[in-house]
């Protein structure tokens, strides 16, 4: 398993505005999309490509094209949906699947409540979108689910991560073809398993508090 923290001044700037509790939901959504596009640029460095023949207005030449089947993008519902536009802006030909997962606030374990994915992911590169890597429970189960369907490799794009969550993923998926791409690794988790300093509940800040 590989962990990559994207070091870029624009990433740091946008993340700072996201952290600010006074940033309203419309601005939060827009900045999330922009930040994800920056993270996706680094996350797709290992995307599979092949040589293709094309013809320019001047002559025939050889270029680069994405290998088929194209990558699969999987946002974790609901907060991961706020990252989807930023990802598909960079990979518009990618297919999109969905995993609905929620955290049990008592056990802190992840519960899968919905999925819309191909049954067979053999040979597919998968990009999982989940803004907060806190305890690691959600991504741990998502990665296990995708590998069970024979995904080739999995890259998880997160806005923030905590050392506890990264270690939990490493314990279960060490040696696996998994990459975690983040804007920042924060100090740790508080007693409610929220990332500190963090940015609060990403889903609530994207869409407002429901229920």
UniProtKB/Swiss-Prot annotation:
Q: What is its EC number?
A: 2.4.2.9
Q: Which GO terms describe its biological process?
A: UMP salvage; uracil salvage
Q: Tell me the residue numbers annotated for binding 5-phospho-alpha-D-ribose 1-diphosphate.
A: 78, 103, 130-138, 201
CDD domains xref list: PRTases_typeI
Keyword check for Transferase, yes or no: yes
Q: Which InterPro entries match?
A: PRibTrfase_dom, PRTase-like, Upp_B, UPRTase/APRTase, Ura_phspho_trans
Q: Where does uracil bind?
A: 195, 200-202
Q: Which GO terms describe its molecular function?
A: GTP binding; magnesium ion binding; uracil phosphoribosyltransferase activity
Chemical reaction(s) catalysed? UMP + diphosphate = 5-phospho-alpha-D-ribose 1-diphosphate + uracil
User: Its pathway?
Assistant: Pyrimidine metabolism; UMP biosynthesis via salvage pathway; UMP from uracil: step 1/1
The note on cofactor binding and number reads: Binds 1 Mg(2+) ion per subunit. The magnesium is bound as Mg-PRPP.
Cross-referenced Gene3D superfamilies: 3.40.50.2020
Q: Tell me where on the tree of life, at the top rank, the source sits.
A: Bacteria
Reported regulation of activity? Allosterically activated by GTP.
Query: What does the record give as cofactor?
Result: Mg(2+)
Pfam families for this protein: UPRTase
Ordered alphabetically, the record's keywords are:
Allosteric enzyme, Glycosyltransferase, GTP-binding, Magnesium, Nucleotide-binding, Transferase
Can you tell me which family this protein belongs to? Belongs to the UPRTase family.
User: What biological function has been recorded for the protein in this entry?
Assistant: Catalyzes the conversion of uracil and 5-phospho-alpha-D-ribose 1-diphosphate (PRPP) to UMP and diphosphate.
HAMAP family reported in the protein's UniProt record: Upp_B
The protein's name? Uracil phosphoribosyltransferase
Name of the gene this protein is made from = upp
């Amino acid at each position: 398993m590989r962990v990559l923290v994207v070091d870029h001044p624009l990433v740091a700037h946008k993340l700072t505005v996201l952290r600010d509790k006074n940033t309203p939901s419309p601005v939060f959504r827009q900045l999330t999309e922009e930040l994800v596009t920056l993270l996706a640029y680094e996350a797709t460095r290992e995307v599979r490509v092949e040589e293709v023949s094309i013809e320019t207005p001047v002559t025939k030449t050889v270029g680069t094209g994405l290998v088929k089947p194209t990558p699969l993008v999987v946002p974790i519902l609901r907060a991961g949906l706020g990252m989807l536009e930023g990802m598909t802006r960079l990979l518009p030909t990618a297919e999109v699947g969905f995993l609905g997962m929620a955290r049990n606030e008592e056990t802190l374990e992840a519960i899968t409540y919905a999925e819309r994915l191909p049954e067979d992911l053999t040979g597919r590169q998968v990009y999982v979108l989940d803004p907060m890597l806190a305890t690691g429970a959600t991504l741990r189960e998502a990665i296990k689910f995708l590998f069970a369907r024979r995904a080739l490799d999995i890259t998880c794009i997160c806005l923030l991560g905590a050392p506890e969550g990264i270690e939990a993923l490493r314990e279960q998926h060490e040696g696996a073809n998994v990459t975690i791409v983040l804007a920042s690794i924060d100090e740790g988790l508080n007693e409610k398993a929220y990332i500190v300093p963090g940015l609060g509940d990403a889903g609530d800040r994207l869409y407002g508090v429901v229920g």
